[in-house]
Structures are given as C-alpha cells and as structure tokens.
C-alpha cells in the first residue's frame, strides 16, 4: 500500500534512486496504491549525469510493495521494499533495464513493456 509521502526505491536505470509519491492516479480521492498502479512522484535522490535529476516530477508504476497481495489461487506474495519503475506520459519505461523481480500483477494493467526488461517475474 503506497500513499502520498511514501518513499520508494527505483527499479530501473533512469537515473533516479529514490522517489516520493505525491499522488495516486485513478479516482479523485484515492488514498492507496498497489502493484500496477500509476503514481506521480518527485525524485528525492538521483545519480549524477543521468537523465532524471533531483526534484523532478515523474510518473511511475508500482512494481513491488511490502504489503502482501492476494492472488486468485489463494497465494499471497510480498516483497522486502516498495519499488517503482519510472515511465513517460504514454506508459513506456524511461529506463532500459529493470533491477530485481517484478510482480505478475503488473501484466494485467497493460504495462507489458516493463515485464520483458525484468530479470524475474514472480
């Protein structure tokens, strides 16, 4: 569960290291975001000489959360950290690589371009 003011790590090589969620897109009063949701975030920590700079506002897709997600077959899955992958306005990833596993739930939300970049899909 991601809410505004939540800090997230970045799963791609776009140049950002940490993001802070400022809005969950969807309904006008949406309070929480889960895997596969789009958020608007601000870059809090960045790598020097990379495309994304500190204090830049970006869109991102949540790919891992600490809060467990229940699947249709009864299995629950959770991760050790909250992680997002940065995207552009059309939903295409800004980075060329994704680090760490990505939850299978993000496939159902039409983010099929992030799935092939990931080394593992859980």
UniProtKB/Swiss-Prot annotation:
A Pfam family hit: Ribosomal_L14
Name this protein carries in UniProt: Large ribosomal subunit protein uL14c
Gene Ontology biological-process entries: translation
InterPro entries: Ribosomal_uL14, Ribosomal_uL14_bac-type, Ribosomal_uL14_sf
Superkingdom of the source species: Eukaryota
Biological role: Binds to 23S rRNA.
Annotated source species: Anthoceros angustus (Hornwort)
The entry's keywords: Chloroplast, Plastid, Ribonucleoprotein, Ribosomal protein, RNA-binding, rRNA-binding
Signal peptide: none
GO molecular function, one term: structural constituent of ribosome
Name of the gene: rpl14
Family named by the database record: Belongs to the universal ribosomal protein uL14 family.
SUPFAM superfamilies (alphabetical): Ribosomal protein L14
GO cellular component: chloroplast; cytosolic large ribosomal subunit
Oligomer status and interactors: Part of the 50S ribosomal subunit.
Localization in the cell: Plastid, Chloroplast
């Amino acid at each position: 569960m991601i809410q505004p003011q939540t800090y997230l790590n970045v799963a791609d090589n776009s140049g950002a290291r940490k993001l802070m969620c400022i809005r969950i897109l969807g309904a006008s009063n949406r309070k929480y975001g889960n895997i596969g949701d789009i958020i608007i975030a601000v870059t809090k920590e960045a790598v020097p000489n990379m495309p994304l700079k500190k204090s830049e506002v970006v869109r991102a897709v949540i790919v891992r959360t600490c809060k467990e997600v229940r699947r249709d077959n009864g299995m629950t899955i959770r991760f050790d950290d909250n992680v997002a992958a940065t995207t552009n306005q059309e939903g295409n990833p800004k980075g060329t690589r994704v680090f760490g596993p990505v939850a299978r739930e993000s496939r159902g939300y039409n983010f099929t371009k992030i799935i092939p970049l990931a080394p593992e899909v859980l």
